[in-house]
Amino acid sequence: QRQMCIRDSVITGEAYGSAYVTMNSKALGADVTYAWPDASIGMMDANEAAKIMYADDIAKSADVQSVISEKAAEYAALQSGVESAAARGYVDTIINPEDTRKYVAAAFEMLYTKREDRPDKKHGTV
């Protein structure tokens, strides 16, 4: 059975955890994934991750908020920034918001003739 379905994604804001993974991520077979420069992609929000990972440092600090901000910035740069997501292959291209329509249209043109060969049945016993 031959099927055609273009799977194109644009990440415009926060894409965290299993919610991101299940909503047409590269891991589930998206053909093209774009992200805006201010998007955040990862397992969790950088502030929340910093609170968990650096709880001891935060507890010892007199200025809790500055330590959280500092550690969150480090975490975001290494784990949840759009550049790190692109380096890991989760995002194909980082695009400016004003260019979104152009890139999505180009992806549709590129994938217009896409065909997938799939088995007739999803489950062989049914």
Positions of the model-derived regions?
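Ligand-binding clefts of soluble mixed alpha/beta catalytic domains
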Residues: 1-3, 7-126
